Design a protein with these regions (language model features):
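Inter-motif core of Ras-like GTPase G domains
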Residues: 59-77
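NTP-binding/hydrolysis catalytic cores, primarily Walker-type P-loop NTPases
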Residues: 143-241
């Protein structure tokens, strides 16, 4: 108990985190000790989310003996969907009928992802969330930083999943799709605005004419800078000769 209390990290108000051991494996801990640990945590917390190891093994079986509902995380890839379908089958074999699907890293550019096609492959009915692929999330993960959902668009995307965790009720699938589409639309709009060049503005040129028009966009690109770089490159080539 003392070791567990020391290992628990407070993340935010009403949210604690117990990191996995970096040395002990599931096989080393054993089912009995693991169940004892989770039951001890149940006496302290209202909700416990367990990040299960990938695949289907003894670790999953130990978890399924304890949980009241499952979130099956999968990707919009054929292999991942097949694995997700197998995970659902394992849940049913353990008499767990309360589960929701969380589609992770769903592409937002150039690919048409059909929610109902994925559900058909999984033979599932309830959707917990459609989580879009976002490079910012990868950066946060690599750097070990937490994402502030209060000021991020992911807050709305994850709202259906949070409701499922708290209440056990799933949103209608079209409402989940609507949240995802709204996120994608906003991202595309922000991207288009960032790439749109500004109008021409007066500025000094490399030719010394103060009235020469200097084209600048929001990314910092300028015709002046390119011309200067071109002249410098030409000068270097001539000097080398």
């Amino acid at each position: 108990k003392e070791y567990t209390d020391d290992a628990i990290v407070s993340i935010a108000e009403n949210l604690d985190f117990l990191p996995a051991s970096q040395s002990a494996r599931w096989e080393d801990i054993g089912r009995k000790k693991y169940k004892k640990l989770v039951r001890r945590l149940c006496d302290v917390y209202d909700y416990i989310l367990i990040d299960a190891p990938a695949g289907i093994g003894k670790g999953i079986e130990s978890i399924l003996d304890l949980v009241s509902r499952c979130i099956v995380v999968t990707h919009p890839l054929w292999v991942s969907l097949r694995n997700g379908a197998r995970m659902i089958q394992v849940c049913q074999e353990h008499n767990i009928r309360d589960f929701a699907i969380a589609f992770n890293a769903v592409p937002v550019d150039g690919e048409d992802i059909d929610l109902y096609d994925m559900l058909e492959v999984l033979r599932a009915e309830y959707v917990g969330a459609m989580i879009p692929y976002d490079e910012d999330i990868l950066t946060y993960t690599q750097d070990g930083h937490l994402l502030d959902l209060a000021s991020h668009e992911f807050r709305n995307v994850l709202a259906p999943l949070v409701d499922y965790v708290v209440t056990g009720d799933c949103w209608e699938d079209y409402d989940v799709q609507k949240q995802f589409d709204a996120y994608v639309t906003k991202k595309k709009t922000d991207k288009e605005e960032a790439c749109t060049p500004t109008l021409a503005s007066a500025g000094e040129s490399i030719f010394g004419d103060s009235n020469t028009v200097l084209y600048i966009n929001r990314g910092g690109w300028t015709t002046q800078r390119l011309l200067v770089q071109g002249k410098q490159s030409l000068w270097r080539r001539r000097k080398l000769k």
